[in-house]
Amino acid sequence: MQIQNSHDLSSSNTLQLRSLAERFVELYTPADLSTLLMNPELKNLPWKILGGGSNLVLPSQIEGLVLKVSNLGRKLIHEDPDYWFVKAQAGEVWNDFVQWTLEEGYWGLENLSLIPGTVGAAPIQNIGAYGVEVKDTLWEVHALDLQTGEPRVFSNKECQFSYRDSYFKQEGAGRYLIWDVTFRLPKKNVLHLEYGDIRKEVERNNWPQDPRHVAQAVINIRQSKLPDPKVIGNAGSFFKNPIVSKELRDGLLSKHNDLVSFPYEDRYKLAAGWLIDRAGWKGKKLGPVGMYEKQALVLVNHGGATADDVWKLARQVSSDVHTQFGVEIEAEPIRW
């Protein structure tokens, strides 16, 4: 374990923002964390946890110590007549893990294919796509207490999941470091084809309706709409889909008959991309940043942007959507 000073994080965040960490270290074992906690100088610094950097807006300068979780490994740890229990270390790339489960014949995560980031970051955000969220199959989270180094296991309920949110993003933020995650994947195959164009993509290719082809359909759709962060800096979907009352949704629908919405519990989820597009921001730039020309929900860095540029655009887009539709849209990435 090596502590690095003035570490450049420009290539460690998918928005490709220029950012310099005062101190930086990669963790491979729980003992590495214990070593840090025994160092009075380091222990008293502010700490930040870095995963794949795909859901972060980083400032130009980061004071304190940035910890990157780099542990790797994935395996089947148990099965019963109804479920497979699969564990993945936090440092695993999320999509690599999803594709591995499918190769091994375990399904349930196929709709979450090609989402950027790491396994450890997935529960924090309760990542989701095409009608599926991490909370649907997550069994438990193994975390380390950043104050003591002691392990703690969180059940699904204790994670307090909600839409793009969890305990680890709220009360537990900065307190726990997620070390590994166990998923309970159903042996009874239930496909989710109703969201987006998944069914159309499967049928267009004359594929059988099975998990591996659903995953490929999701990959094809995402690649056609979302920019590769290695080519154009972005954090994927930048805004959450707002959840509104039936009354507000019906009122909007009476004025906009092509409004895109989905039932969500006893309310409705509106497509933020549709709102942003109709507010005139699809393909539009503000300085070095803009909303992607193929998907209005994606904020992109055209080069040389800072966190201030990102938030200036986000505020303007949000304001224009609210002015036109009376709906608040909230940024999804975490602000450091």
Curated annotation (Swiss-Prot):
Is Transcription one of the keywords? no
Recorded hits in Gene3D superfamilies, A to Z, give: 3.30.465.10, UDP-N-acetylenolpyruvoylglucosamine reductase, C-terminal domain, Uridine Diphospho-n-acetylenolpyruvylglucosamine Reductase, domain 2
Cofactors (names) = FAD
| MF term (GO), any | FAD binding
Q: What's one GO-annotated cellular component? A: cytosol
Question: What does it catalyze?
Answer: UDP-N-acetyl-alpha-D-muramate + NADP(+) = UDP-N-acetyl-3-O-(1-carboxyvinyl)-alpha-D-glucosamine + NADPH + H(+)
| PROSITE patterns xref list | FAD_PCMH
**What protein does this entry describe?**
UDP-N-acetylenolpyruvoylglucosamine reductase
